[in-house]
């Protein structure tokens, strides 16, 4: 059995809080995956970090309990433990860093706006909406969001923050 999932180590260590939204509610560590696999008679025999989606983990499990796990399995267990991922302290720090990041981003954007500069968002994926909503970035800060001309989001508005999504041609024309 092979599964690939967002890896919590990347999400937390790289402050990728914007990737947590309705389509991405699961972020795994190897230890909880091991518990899950054991519940169904599987044994993790390999695990590797892969770059997909900002950092994922590919886990190989087998019903054959005689297969010896690769060195990668122990290496990742040790990495997660050494980084404190099995403690609440790690997640409290993550929460604190997210709040600091929000303040830093708002200050940066506000300073640019005070200079009467335009600020345009480029692209409107799901994680964009998470960032906009959490940081309360609206049309007072961002002028609009530019999106590819094939997007179904064109001429619509972002939820909650009400930013208009315009064809990127408008952005290139008005630089």
Q: At which residue positions do the language-model features occur?
A:
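Short beta-strand segments
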Residues: 2-4, 46-48, 58-62, 120-122
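Short, glycine-/aromatic-enriched active-site segment of Class I SAM-dependent methyltransferases
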Residues: 3-26, 30-33, 37
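Short, solvent-exposed loop/turn segments at secondary-structure junctions
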Residues: 7-10, 52, 66, 125-129, ...
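Short aromatic-enriched loop/helix-cap "lid" or pocket-rim segments at secondary-structure transitions
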Residues: 12-16, 59, 157-158
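Conserved S-adenosyl-L-methionine
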Residues: 42-53
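Flexible, glycine-/basic-rich loop-and-beta segments that form/coincide
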Residues: 53-101
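A short, well-structured juxtamembrane/interface segment
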Residues: 97-115
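A solvent-exposed beta-alpha-beta segment
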Residues: 110-175
